[in-house]
Amino acid sequence: MASWFRSKKFVEAKYKEAKENLLTKYGELGFRDAIIVADSVVPHNEQDVNIYISIEEGQKYYIRNIEWVGNTLYPTDVLNKLLQMKKGDVYNQTLMNERLMTDEDAVGNLYYNNGYVFSRIDPVETNIVGDSIDLEMRIFEGPQARISHVRISGNDRVYENVIRRELRNKPGDLFSREAL
């Protein structure tokens, strides 16, 4: 815990954040049910405090199966390759969410870069047997979006036509986050 408290002063808000970070870290290690069952901050002397945290880790979980539902545009093997998680891997919800939506080469970006800005991927735990979790990735692809208008403002030194010429996204094109 000491690495989370760099300041010399105990701050309640940072302590709460540190406890959340601790549980997140447990989740990344496969302990999705980890909870803090007790914690206390006890003054040691006038300058220091002792922090006691009792954690119930619960079961460590692994991925048993990953099934994709609703993917009509891209085959399952392409989505699995982008997800980079497979049977037997430690169940890491943080990594899964990053691989689905936030990483540069995430599954969601495959859809976004091809105009599917309204797409959504909902990971659902469908079955838990012992230490194994079955996942169902529910994809709602939605309609493709096109760029209807590009507004340019604040250009004092460069003519608008020069800026428009350099744009990769033009009106009528499919939306692509990558091309922005």
Which residue ranges define each predicted feature?
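Interaction-mediating elements
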Residues: 1-180
